[in-house]
C-alpha cells in the first residue's frame, strides 16, 4: 500500500478477497468485505445476519463490524477509516467492486480520496513464486485431464448442461472442484 501511496484498500467479494485472505464470498447487493490498512489487521464489514458465516471465513483479524438491514455498511467502512486515522487519506477500491459500492463509500466518507486499488491487487497477484507457479501448472494439468475425459464422452446431441455436469464430475474425480 505504501509503495503506491494508498492508505487503505477496500476489497469486496471475489477473487482478490479469496487470493489475499482465503475468504470465499459471493457478490450480492449486500456488502461483505474488508478494509486493509498499511499497518495492523483489516477491518471486516458484514451483514449482521451473515456474521456467523463471516466469522467462519475470516482468518486474518478480529475486528468484524456487522450492519443491520436498515443501516449502511458504508458508514462502517467510513468509521474504520476514521478509527485508523485515514479518513482523509487515499483509499483504494478493488477493481471489480461494483460502482454502487464505491459510490456508497464516497458518500459516507466524503473526505477520503478514492482511487483505483489495481496497483495493489494486480501488483501483488501478478508476481508468482515457484510454489504458486507449480500450483497453477498442476491446476492446468488437472483441467486438461478433465476436458480430455469429457471430450471422449461427447456425442451428437450432448447438451451443454450434460457436458458441464460431466466436466464437474471429472474434476471431482481428480480431487478438485471444477
Predicted region positions:
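A composition/biophysics-driven feature that prefers long, compositionally simple stretches
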Residues: 1-145
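Active-site cores enriched in adjacent His and Asp/Glu residues with nearby glycine-rich loops
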Residues: 3-17, 141-178
